[in-house]
Amino acid sequence: WDWSTAGDDEREEATHEYLKIKGSFVYEKNLKPEFVWYNGHADRYLLGDPVAEEGITALNPPKGDIRDPEAKIWPFKVHRAMQPYDTENRYLMQPVTAGEGGFWREFNWDQAIQLGSEVTGMDYSGEFGFAATSMYWPQTHMVAPKEQALQCKACHCERGCIDWEAIGYPGDPLKWGSRNRIHREDLAGAGEQR
């Protein structure tokens, strides 16, 4: 969802692609989730926290990694967006969208951000841009019935649905061994036939 494209009078509206009040967005069907380690806890972006200097500001990154014995591999849908932020103070801003002076009436980001700063009590330098953000949504609803659950080979095959290297394995753990073995041996000899 790209708020930076909102307010464009020249762009044609399309319900699932662009709305003047919201900007552009992409809907996907049968979206393949992203798999990450998750121990049931997450960090949270709090109003006033700095945005990432480079890259993406994660609003609620799941906690856990391959070395965390409490963590399990979880599927997440990751919502990516471009959101307004104060370029001098380097934090996300909460614009007023509805009502008098709101963005949806005036289509003026500077004014909407200024009004939002008055509501939140945050300083606004008068300089804004749009920062890349991500929000992790655990896939715990709208999940297929158990009869349609993935079988082992959906992940443990050459083109499986999990990117093993992205979550800390040197390859498929069926070949390389469990996370305990991998870290116990510090990857020395992992994956070799014994």
Q: Residue ranges of each PLM-predicted region?
A:
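Primarily the internal scaffold of c-type cytochrome electron-transfer domains
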Residues: 1-150, 157-194
